[in-house]
Amino acid sequence: MRPCSFSPPISSTMPFTPDSDLELSFPAELIPTDLNNRLAQHNLHIRPLASSDHGRGHIRVLASLTSVADPGEKAWRERFYELAKSNTSASKYYICVIVSKETDELVATGTVFLEPKFLRSLATAGHIEDIAVDTSMQGRGLGKILISALTTLSEKAGAYKTLLDCSDDNVPFYKKCGYDVKGLQMSKYT
């Protein structure tokens, strides 16, 4: 894996690629249209992750969240297809991205995955993960729009709850998104 460069989004004017010209990880119609209406005034667009988004800076945006090594385009695409294929099984991964219409580069990303359970009469729980907004775009409400999209995807899929883990510093933000503190997260890294 190559280390990720922390360069800002490309500022050249590449033509915006419409959803219909992309191989998306799930149907774009599942994302509420009102979110794109809100983003349009800022020349931004929300959609599912596309098979070509490695080249649009997906790893760069994730690097604004945590340390990320770039696996290279081939390995990235293999993971894309693995996750997109999961959307035909009980476990589903919905990865949303926000794209600049000026540059056709990603500026934010987030994931919700659906976990089938034996609890609650074979219910499903949604887990929100990897909310990342490019450092140059933070403070503009993009994280809140991602959380709204991912929560809606979870609810439309029938999840009985949607949960996420966050640092104490981010609790006020997630409370604004309608989430409450429940329990305590434990982790063991290998």
Regions found by a protein language model. Give the residues of each.
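Conserved beta-strand-loop-alpha-helix junction that forms the acyl-donor binding cleft
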Residues: 163-172, 180, 187-190
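Conserved acetyl-CoA-binding loop-helix of GNAT-fold acetyltransferases
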Residues: 130-133, 139-152, 176
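Short amphipathic alpha-helix that is part of the acyltransferase structural core
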Residues: 23-78
